[in-house]
């Protein structure tokens, strides 16, 4: 990432951010994890080059339940890498690039989500305080329970909370 900042008065604002994706296997760190002790394997791929094809293959070969979510960016979709995973979480735009149709949870922001042909309404948020991270909260709640409605509720609670980094 390269960020460019602008100062106006006493405040500094992010003016521009340029993200680069590097999927070269040779530049990725060696991931040496014994996956046999885990019940499920969940990947949140933020497209920084750490989730490489050999690790995706290792996850599939572990014989565990697998989940994948990938960061939306201006780069072409990388969901093709996760077609063989048991569950995929993506937004509507990304869902159009996926041939797999079962066990795909499509997030729709304030419009809720859909999974396996069922729509799940979002929970009303009167005073959104912090929307950054709502998708991560949704994904964590979905992983914990497998319930898209519960995940929507937790994401709404998060948006209304005052969470500071």
Ranges and model annotations:
Residues 1-131, 146, 150-165:
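Ribokinase/PfkB-type carbohydrate-kinase core domain
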Residues 135:
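Conserved single-residue anchors adjacent to enzymatic active/cofactor-binding motifs
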Residues 142-143:
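4′-phosphopantetheine-dependent carrier domains
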